[in-house]
């Protein structure tokens, strides 16, 4: 397995161009199964999870071509309706194939999924949502099997809890249902809005995305179209933190500041000077150490759980003590023991971590456990004394496009060491 070797004590400064959002590109690629005509998706990042999705869609009979940042999807001749275990096991997002398959073809089956090792992320909300739209669901031999006679039927669905994944599944399936569907307590993330905008480009009638009440008027078919995936707010936040923890200055280009309000507020609280334009953000630490901050993760527009690991690192090298409470996923502090091996001082109590800032971390051999945790370990290596080796970086390749190239452009001394 590949590793990163990072030489530390670097002030990270410069410009970085932000890639398309993984968390929008994935649901949009799966939603393209609903289209009877070809679709062109622009600004699609080159990531492991995207490659897996393309393989899966191809296996279902979709014609797919990649050309730089664009992906051309033609699902007009889909003739397979099963997403098999060997592709699904590495990626939880595969469950998003189920809604479009049953909505358009009346049948679909997906192996129960894999992905990051972050606590329990059950698929039950996806299943109950599809059942409320009239699908019959069976769990057999490790597969979720969905079927319906005729079309799905619109329904009034109140979600038990806010779930990005289940909101995408229900919204996608409801686009081709008969009648109107209302989703109450829907997730409000920018990636949900992007998926809805994509579907509307193809002829869907979705309103209210970005609020907790989404209305979908069913249509009989979706056509083709061209759509540009929104920029990755989590990648943007990660590079802003890189400058914040190293006393540096960074400008993130081709991003969307309006998707990062909670993150920018906390960076300002930590002492960063921040300016924003329509599609750029600049952060200047002016050589200062950040101040520790206290926050809790929450569904959008609250503080994103996908930025929690990076801000844990910020707190661990900040002045003072900060408390972080994780309310979205259990078991999402697996990076903290690794950072403690680098000299950080922290206590974990249930879903809370208390971070006591230290002036300097020391390089060590550490292991990535999930996507965002691995990013925090790489950033820690950039500022630690000495050399840090980050193992199991396949996690990072699932969600960051060419992270080592982008960090090098900011002055990081990082190299990929090929594994056996």
Swiss-Prot record:
Q: What is its main location?
A: cytoplasm
Q: Which reaction does it catalyse?
A: phosphoenolpyruvate + UDP-N-acetyl-alpha-D-glucosamine = UDP-N-acetyl-3-O-(1-carboxyvinyl)-alpha-D-glucosamine + phosphate
Chain segments annotated as transmembrane: none
**GO cellular-component term (any):** cytoplasm
Q: What keywords is this UniProt entry annotated with?
A: Cell cycle, Cell division, Cell shape, Cell wall biogenesis/degradation, Cytoplasm, Peptidoglycan synthesis, Pyruvate, Transferase
Which cell locations does it reside in?
Answer: Cytoplasm
Entry's CDD domains?
UdpNAET
Per UniProt, where does phosphoenolpyruvate bind?
22-23
Q: Which Gene3D superfamilies match?
A: Enolpyruvate transferase domain
Q: Does the keyword field hold Zinc?
A: no
Which EC class, in a word?
transferase
The pathway this protein participates in, as annotated, is:
Cell wall biogenesis; peptidoglycan biosynthesis
Q: Which residues form the active site?
A: 116
Gene Ontology MF terms: UDP-N-acetylglucosamine 1-carboxyvinyltransferase activity
Q: What is its EC number?
A: 2.5.1.7
**Claim: Manganese is one of the keywords in the record:** no
List positions binding UDP-N-acetyl-alpha-D-glucosamine. Answer: 92, 121-125, 161-164, 306, 328
Listed SUPFAM superfamilies = EPT/RTPC-like
Q: Which residues carry this modification: 2-(S-cysteinyl)pyruvic acid O-phosphothioketal?
A: 116
Q: NCBIfam families attached here?
A: murA (TIGR01072), PRK09369.1 (NF006873)
The UniProt family comment states: Belongs to the EPSP synthase family. MurA subfamily.
HAMAP family this protein is in? MurA
* Summary of the function given for this chain in its UniProt record: Cell wall formation. Adds enolpyruvyl to UDP-N-acetylglucosamine.
**Name under which the protein is recorded:** UDP-N-acetylglucosamine 1-carboxyvinyltransferase
Q: Give the species.
A: Yersinia pestis
Q: Which gene encodes it?
A: murA
